[in-house]
A protein has these predicted regions:
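C-terminal regions of mature proteins
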Residues: 209-214, 333, 365-370, 374-464
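Bacterial N-terminal signal peptides
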Residues: 5-15
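M16/insulysin-pitrilysin zinc metalloprotease superfamily fold
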Residues: 77-81, 113-144, 296, 320-390, ...
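Non-catalytic beta-strand/loop surface segments
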Residues: 18-59, 81-120, 153-207, 231-280, ...
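Active-site SXXK
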Residues: 65-79
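PAPS/PAP-binding and catalytic site of the sulfotransferase fold
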Residues: 126, 210, 221-228, 347-351
Length: 464
């Protein structure tokens, strides 16, 4: 067993706990390469198990975009070599288990929650689903139809469509430009042989991580993991090392403007900016700016887009997407179509002020500090509260641990000993730090702007 400094890294990437006392835990890498993290939480009789695989749309090309998503469906909803779909579903219900899966640009995750008394069943069924997959044509055809319906829904949802278009144009020339959900034409012609090839290539234990959080005995679960997953080393040893053309996303060369038309009543304008990847030192600053601009009761963007006491836009939101090799900062607005140009102009004008904005009361003379809004302190409090609230969910915590120990293994040399724990850095963040971050990423000089307008008959326009 190869041990690593996972606990240190967990605190670096904001997945460390802020409990009065850290829960008991174990962390290691098996000889076959599987990264493991176990944490005991006995205040609720539940066990949460997450298995993460380092495969996503970043590993596809134009001829395979959608196979990862299809594979996720087949593992989640399909049969195994030992049981039919109906038999598996019956056993899941009998044991009170909830099973789900997600695919992103970087990872595929499988999440299982169930009563603590049935934790062994959870391990057994998860292992069976992941490593004893049975691909049969009727199930493949069924899941394809489900995905086609998902794709249609996304094309008709202005929020989802705008996000896809923004990311596509922000990451031109990089695998991140490909949609996570895939392309219909690729999925339609995907064969069992192609799916199986993808499955065998990426479902090797050195490419995976396992996290367990809940009411468990650490030693007993540790032994179960070694017995259940340790013997799969023969598969790992026979597999060729994964070769990836892993590289940072190229910088955006110039502003891109995209217009689409849908059968909707309101207009939607979305701005997308390049942002730092997961684990980057600037991640924290943009986390806080994200809260200040678009979250909470009175986000700063609302103030910026208000004239004469009336809002120019509604449903203002911000979103920071962190990926392994790049990031995106998105600003969403909804408005009456006649206000589109005004909102675009006002938003860009406002973003150009963020480099010298007073985020903290410390930016003002002492006599004025009691009269101003301290955006920085409010955001810090929200970070701590949200962090604690997030980790109180065992499945959320397990998801974070699985994702981040896998990331740590890939980037250990870049991270070890180079940064203080996340919450320490939150407390130390200053208004000057936010101004520097805003200047670096949100200057408004280069961006992708997506506008979704209400008229589906006019087709599409792309301006570069």
């Amino acid at each position: 067993v190869k041990t690593i400094g996972i606990i240190i890294f967990i605190s670096l990437l904001a997945v460390g706990t802020v409990w009065a006392e850290d829960p008991p835990s174990k962390h290691y890498i098996l000889n076959n390469g599987l990264s493991v993290y176990i944490q005991k939480r006995d205040h609720i009789p539940l066990v949460n198990i997450v298995f993460a695989v380092n495969v996503g749309s970043k590993d596809e090309d134009q001829n395979t975009n959608g196979i990862v998503h299809l594979l996720e469906h087949l593992i989640l909803l399909g049969p195994t070599q030992f049981q039919t779909v109906d038999e598996i579903n019956l056993e899941m219900r009998r044991h009170g288990a909830q099973f789900n899966a997600h695919t992103s640009h970087d990872l595929m995750t499988f999440e299982l929650s169930l009563p603590a008394q049935y934790w062994e069943f959870g391990f057994n069924i998860l292992k069976e689903k992941l490593f004893h997959l049975k691909l049969v044509q009727p199930q493949v055809d069924k899941e394809k139809e489900i995905i086609f319906e998902e794709l249609s829904q996304h094309q008709e949802d202005p929020y989802a469509l705008a996000t896809y278009l923004a990311v596509e144009h922000l990451f031109k020339g990089h695998p991140y430009q490909q949609p996570v959900y895939g392309v219909r034409s690729v999925i339609e012609k995907a064969t069992i042989e192609e799916i199986e090839t993808f499955y065998k290539k990426y479902f090797v234990l050195s490419n995976c991580a396992l996290a367990v959080v809940g009411d468990v005995d650490l030693a007993v679960v540790d032994n179960k993991i070694r017995q259940g997953f340790g013997h799969l080393g023969e598969i790992e040893e026979s597999a060729a090392p994964l070769e990836r053309d892993s590289k940072p996303a190229p910088p955006l060369k110039k502003t891109v403007k995209v217009e689409r038309y849908l059968d909707i009543n309101k207009a939607h304008v979305i701005f997308a900016f390049e942002a730092p990847p997961l684990g980057h030192p600037d991640q924290l600053g943009l986390d806080i700016i994200n809260l200040i601009l678009g979250k909470g009761i009175n986000p700063l963007l609302s103030r910026a887009l208000t004239r004469m006491g009336k809002p120019l836009a509604h449903n203002l939101q911000t979103r920071y997407i962190m990926m392994e090799y790049g990031g995106a900062f998105l600003i969403y607005t909804t408005m009456e179509p006649k206000k589109v140009n005004q909102v675009r102009m006002e938003l860009i004008k406002f973003l150009k002020t963020l480099w010298n904005f007073n985020y903290s009361k410390e930016d003002y003379p002492l006599g004025q500090q009691s009269e101003v809004t301290d955006y920085l302190e409010a955001a810090k409090s929200q970070v701590k509260f949200s962090h604690q609230q997030f980790l109180e969910s065992g499945i959320n915590a397990a998801l974070s641990y699985a994702r981040n120990i896998l990331f740590y293994k890939l980037h250990q040399d870049e991270i070890d000993g180079k940064r203080e724990p996340y919450m320490v850095r939150v407390d130390k963040t200053t208004s000057a730090d936010l101004r520097n971050t805003a200047s670096r990423y949100l200057s408004g000089e280069k961006y992708v702007m997506v506008t979704i307008l209400p008229d589906k008959k006019k087709g599409k326009k792309v301006k570069k």
